[in-house]
UniProtKB/Swiss-Prot annotation:
When the channel is activated, one or more imidazole moieties of His-37 probably become bi-protonated. This is Matrix protein 2. Belongs to the influenza viruses matrix protein M2 family. The lineage of its organism: Viruses, Riboviria, Orthornavirae, Negarnaviricota, Polyploviricotina. Residues 60-84 are annotated as: Disordered. It comes from Influenza A virus (strain A/Swine/Tennessee/24/1977 H1N1). It comes from the Viruses.
């Protein structure tokens, strides 16, 4: 006799479980956690690009400019832009002496 026939048997035209511990709170908690894990995994696969792009680039917004005068903000922007212009898409080699 297989395990399948011992556990799942047709009862009144539907499948039922003859497990004695099916009302155990631990089993219910494990089922809920399993279902939540499956839902989160599906959402992660559906929105992979959005979620991971948010974590990867969303946290790198640069220093806060709150309370900094506008002239200093503009100076900072110009420094950042000049650093990008100098690099021009190539690696910068730094020689240590």
């Amino acid at each position: 006799m297989s395990l399948l026939t011992e556990v799942e048997t047709p009862i009144r035209s539907e499948w039922g479980c003859r497990c004695n511990d099916s009302g155990d709170p631990l089993v219910a908690a494990a089922s809920i956690i399993g279902i939540l894990h499956l839902i989160l995994w599906i959402l992660d696969r559906l929105f992979f690009k959005c979620i991971h792009r948010r974590f990867k680039y969303g946290l790198k917004r640069g220093p806060s400019t709150e309370g900094v005068p506008e002239s200093m903000r503009e100076e900072y922007r110009q420094k950042q832009q000049s650093a990008v212009d100098v690099d021009d898409g190539h690696f910068v080699n730094i020689a240590l002496e």
